[in-house]
From Swiss-Prot:
Its biological purpose: Nucleotide-binding protein.
Alphabetical UniProt keywords: Nucleotide-binding
Recorded GO CC terms: cytosol
Domain of life, source organism: Bacteria
One annotated GO molecular function: nucleotide binding
Stored Pfam families: DUF520
The keyword Nucleotide-binding is assigned to this record: yes
CDD domains (UniProt xref): YajQ_like
InterPro entries in the record: DUF520 (IPR007551), UPF0234-like_C (IPR035571), UPF0234_N (IPR035570), YajQ-like_sf (IPR036183)
The protein's name: Nucleotide-binding protein Tbd_1846
Length: 161
């Protein structure tokens, strides 16, 4: 029985490379000369530091550009609020969302079941497994999910016959 998995994954190495590129660009740009602007990473949690709110927004824009150039979807970034650090410095927490959450998984399964396609969808941890009798029906399901869930980056893996 053909099946595929709906997942949401981010390549951690590509995120690391993008952060290195951001830090390199910030250190060489004239408008950041003498500032302490940088991006730090610990697993899937990023912290953006800068001297002012304006510089913080600029570093955030550079981060988005570099991530998209490296193939990481920027819809997976969850930006936090601006926090004051010592003196006049500011920081912002950015979380890289991975895995299909339970709410989104339930929404995907409900969307598939409401479409009346002849497939079965089941939630397995942070993935949604979809299986059906024919390949064509599975491809219709992929098109349906792409159309209905556009606010979160999803990948379709393990397409098996």
């Amino acid at each position: 029985m053909p099946s595929f998995d709906i997942v949401s994954e981010v390549d951690k190495q590509e995120v690391r490379n993008a952060i290195d590129q951001v830090n390199k660009e910030v250190s060489t740009r004239f408008d950041f000369k003498g500032s302490d602007a940088r991006v730090e990473q610990s697993d899937y949690a990023l912290t953006v530091y800068a001297d002012t709110d304006f510089q913080l927004d600029q570093v955030q824009d550079i981060l988005s550009q570099k991530l998209s150039k490296r193939g990481v979807d920027v819809k997976c970034l969850d930006t936090g609020n601006v926090e004051k650090v010592s003196g006049n410095k500011v920081k912002r927490s950015v979380t890289v969302k991975t895995g299909v959450g339970t709410e989104l998984a339930k929404k995907i399964v409900k969307c598939i079941k409401d479409s009346k396609l002849k497939v079965q969808a089941s939630i397995q941890g942070e993935t949604v497994r979809v299986s059906g009798a024919k390949r064509d029906v599975l491809q219709e399901t992929i098109a349906l999910v792409k159309k209905s869930v556009s606010d979160f980056p999803l990948q379709y893996q393990n397409f098996r016959d």
